[in-house]
Regions:
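ABC family nucleotide-binding domain
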Residues: 10-233
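Pre-NBD coupling/linker segments of ABC/ABC-like ATPases
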Residues: 1-9
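C-terminal boundary and immediately downstream tail of ABC-type ATPase nucleotide-binding domains
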Residues: 3, 234-256
Length: 256
């Protein structure tokens, strides 16, 4: 496994995965995964479905417990006690495949609810923050629409705004475009690119290779729960060293 020059090498690691193992019964979902995410970096996790990418993401904020190794957040091991784990989750925004919006709340209230219920922010201040975030993702005009009145791409942009409302240190994206119609994928990727340009630390599980190639600072290739290769996108997409990486990208028709 070759490591190319890392643009963010001088930055402190925000998340470190150290020989992480995760088992589901006898099935090994993660098999000795060692990677790190530096501050201000976009790290994309790619590879075939079922290779452990989403599992690693869920281990980052203790939605899943690990069976070996360590996950360090700002140098501190991820807590196993649920109350402390919740505090860690508050520092991370997570965007899921299927939006996970409250269907009975409009877009504005979906974004405002976290700061009110978790951070104890006043409703007025939370709604003011929520409106600014909806403006940021291009949906101020849809603030009073319910999820049923929004397209998939619009719902996912609301979900991104909701995650940002908690002012996270890290944003985790679990295949954020996989449930979208092709014509709405671009609007979500554009919001994510804007966050990257602003210096948000991001870990992204994605099948959007063009996004990974153009936006990521570091790309990690998974197969059968293992990291088969990691490096800058120029290495992964133009000069991969692992045969499995070449096979995977070739299967997708990626030609650099």
């Amino acid at each position: 496994m070759m490591n190319g020059e890392r643009k963010s090498a001088g930055q402190a690691p925000v998340v470190v995965y150290d020989n992480v193992r995760k088992l589901y019964g006898s099935f090994v979902a993660l098999d000795g995964v060692t990677v790190q995410v530096n501050k201000g970096e976009v790290m994309c996790l790619i590879g075939p479905s079922g290779s452990g990418k989403s599992t690693l993401l869920r281990c980052t904020n203790a939605l899943e417990t690990i069976d070996g190794g360590r996950v360090l957040i700002d140098g501190v091991p991820l807590p196993t006690e649920e109350r402390e784990a919740r505090k860690v989750r508050q520092r991370m925004g997570m965007v899921f495949q299927n939006f996970e919006l409250f269907p009975h709340k409009n877009a504005l209230d979906n974004v405002a609810i976290g700061p009110v219920t978790v951070l104890g922010m006043s409703e007025a201040k939370a709604r003011e923050r929520a409106m600014k975030l909806l403006e940021k993702v291009g949906l101020a005009a849809k603030a009073h629409n319910f999820p049923s009145g929004l397209s998939g791409g619009q719902q996912q942009r609301v979900a991104i705004a909701r995650a940002l409302a908690m002012e996270p240190e890290v944003m985790l994206f679990d295949e954020p475009t996989s449930a979208l119609d092709p014509e709405t994928i671009g609007e979500v990727l554009n919001v994510m690119k804007k966050l990257a340009d602003e210096g948000m630390t991001m870990v992204v599980v994605t099948h959007e290779m063009a996004f990974a190639r153009s936006v990521a600072d570091w790309v990690v290739v998974f197969d059968h729960g293992k990291v088969v290769e990691q490096g800058p996108p120029s290495q992964i997409f133009e000069a991969p060293t692992a045969e499995r990486t070449r096979d995977f990208l070739g299967h997708l028709g990626w030609h650099g």
